[in-house]
UniProtKB/Swiss-Prot annotation:
Task performed by this protein: Catalyzes the first step in hexosamine metabolism, converting fructose-6P into glucosamine-6P using glutamine as a nitrogen source.
Ranges for domain Glutamine amidotransferase type-2: 2-218
Name by which UniProt lists this protein: Glutamine--fructose-6-phosphate aminotransferase [isomerizing]
Complexes and interactors: Homodimer.
InterPro entries (alphabetical): GATase_2_dom, GFAT, GFAT_N, GlmS/AgaS_SIS, GlmS/FrlB_SIS, Ntn_hydrolases_N, SIS_dom, SIS_dom_sf
Pfam families xref list: GATase_6, SIS
Keyword Electron transport among UniProt keywords: no
Active-site residue numbers: C2, K604
Name of the coding gene: glmS
Classification via SUPFAM superfamilies: N-terminal nucleophile aminohydrolases (Ntn hydrolases), SIS domain
Amino acid sequence: MCGIVGAIAQRDVAEILLEGLRRLEYRGYDSAGLAVVDAEGHMTRLRRLGKVQMLAQAAEEHPLHGGTGIAHTRWATHGEPSEANAHPHVSEHIVVVHNGIIENHEPLREELKARGYTFVSETDTEVIAHLVNWELKQGGTLREAVLRAIPQLRGAYGTVIMDSRHPDTLLAARSGSPLVIGLGMGENFIASDQLALLPVTRRFIFLEEGDIAEITRRSVNIFDKTGAEVKRQDIESNLQYDAGDKGIYRHYMQKEIYEQPNAIKNTLTGRISHGQVDLSELGPNADELLSKVEHIQILACGTSYNSGMVSRYWFESLAGIPCDVEIASEFRYRKSAVRRNSLMITLSQSGETADTLAGLRLSKELGYLGSLAICNVPGSSLVRESDLALMTNAGTEIGVASTKAFTTQLTVLLMLVAKLSRLKGLDASIEHDIVHGLQALPSRIEQMLSQDKRIEALAEDFSDKHHALFLGRGDQYPIALEGALKLKEISYIHAEAYAAGELKHGPLALIDADMPVIVVAPNNELLEKLKSNIEEVRARGGQLYVFADQDAGFVSSDNMHIIEMPHVEEVIAPIFYTVPLQLLAYHVALIKGTDVDQPRNLAKSVTVE
């Protein structure tokens, strides 16, 4: 959600800002803008509703010169998508971009109106611009004005502030929304995501909660909320912006579906040795902590929540450890009882999901045994704030609908299950079967992808549908949830998932000839139960689409389409059966003509509540 890029240099920075915004497009947005100040203090601002390319075209028509600038992509929260609501916002010579939500913007707006300020947008961000302007009028430097203004804000914010009268300085403040400073040679940068700055630097400082930074071309000074100077370590990033172009693929989502065999190989690299899972990257003290674990609490949102749901079956059935999975936005606002020696596991592709981060911070107050983050972005807030972290190493994921981040999360979770089973002294065959399954997984998915054309043909049946039902049992139920989420995310078809045994408790009332029912049916101990559920749907005229193990004994009929899947090891079946559901959602969206990579109203990284 929302992207920030800022730069202060001797050279013109407009193209640096635009390239940074292009690299943040995957997060989702509805408008874009930038402001540049030259050495004489002349400020030029451009804003456009729509894509960054429209802003870039405007910049070509109105060349921007100046060595100090800030830019932003907006995902609407307060106020509709419009040019007037696009950032940067201005209060005389003060220019502001902001990610997050200012919860007390209404009373602040009334106070500022009473002081004579006029608001020209519906946004909460304009409050920051006027508030800093007011505080600056009371005296002191821009930094002092920001230090007085920031404590008046309630909510989450990552904000960068520029004064056109003093173009030698940028101010930034962080609370709940990430900001990272990029260090150059005689120039410095700031962004909401290090990906935006990789063309200009590899050295970064990640701002911590409550930090306020003063940035010039040759210096970066960081202060806490009291104004006391603090030191933050700079790091050399090896992160690769490896999305590149789409190559032979039509969309990033399609590309990322097909990248999954290699992504999983990357996840496994260096982590399997002599037939065992090797997670020594966790550090020398990790085994001591993990051996104490008597309960696991998983927090996540969206697709990551579904991967947590799958892993619950694994932790309990394979490692013998009770496990609960909760939506992070629910966990943080309820009173919960902490189980003895409970490990908090957080799942997030970006590592910046606001509710998941808040849940992690709450867990530290509640007295959990420790915390472990599973994430795709090194150096993200979730990774930095957790006791332990495991990277999925999926590579940059651009499509808003997560694919390879999901399957690599599951791969990491299954490795963790194997390690915990060994630490608990359980039968060595458990780890052996997991390792064997994971090593086979990339080739199994490659086999599955060869059926893409058949799934594409099936997708035609969904083009005029308004609803769909997904069914699964056991550890395939969360895969049904994920399949339904993918379909609704990118095709805008209302889709729901149920545990197949729940059909008679309500969903069966929805079944008719216009309701497609998608079933995942591996050949496991629940197959016969699942067949009974399928017959209940057939008897009521439902249109069935069954992704079934080739040995499961299904036969296609008028209202039952069987898509045979190669037999796979049972332990990896949930990961494997995810892929055909991803392809189905992709092809349905393609037929319907929706924006596959950036579906309406959605953002890649949800950094506000």
